[in-house]
UniProtKB/Swiss-Prot annotation:
Lineage: Bacteria, Pseudomonadati, Pseudomonadota, Gammaproteobacteria, Lysobacterales
Entries under Pfam families matching the protein: Ribosomal_S17
The encoding gene: rpsQ
A GO term for molecular function: rRNA binding
InterPro entries xref list: NA-bd_OB-fold, Ribosomal_uS17, Ribosomal_uS17_bact/chlr
Function per UniProt: One of the primary rRNA binding proteins, it binds specifically to the 5'-end of 16S ribosomal RNA.
Protein name in UniProt: Small ribosomal subunit protein uS17
GO BP term, pick one: translation
Provenance organism: Xylella fastidiosa (strain 9a5c)
Amino acid sequence: MMNDHNERKPLRTIKGRVISNKMQKTVTVLVERQIKHALYGKYIKRSTKLHAHDADDLCNEGDVVLMTEVAPISKTKNWRVVEIVARSD
């Protein structure tokens, strides 16, 4: 019989744009997604602001970053910046 308790779920990763890096070791990331309207079928943009842990303060405003979900670090922060995909100009 297989023991499924040792297998971990794949970590959730999302991509977003840094809109604020004014806090120490924390960045605010805007994550945009498209949803389909139930009745009319038009695709609508929706966005969410998330706080992510940036231990080395490497991110700047406008950077596109890849984040992964982690155990809660603070009241509002449960994401960690994994890599900077694209730098802002």
